[in-house]
Amino acid sequence: MKQVILVRQDLKMDKGKLTVQVAHASVEATLNSSKKTIHDWKEEGMKKVVLKVSDLKELKKFLIDAKSLGLVTGLIRDAGKTFFKRPTITCLGIGPDDEE
């Protein structure tokens, strides 16, 4: 089992902001998962991978594709109070689910 987290590169987040947004995406997608899925994922070491996408359009394409496959997602919208000037979609968590 694996969780995938996609991060927008066009936002040019600093390392601290990026790290927090990735954590939010992981937690949100996990909280949207079933207890059995979470248990199985934990038993297998909670594998995750962070990948980059170019922009919001590409992120939304992956969101649509993931949902069409029945995968659990967690879309993160930053509140826009520190790094960004307004609410901004930053990351997408997908899964955990089977690696295929």
Where on the chain are the PLM-derived regions?
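Alpha/propeptide regions of enzymes that mature by internal proteolysis
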Residues: 58-64, 71
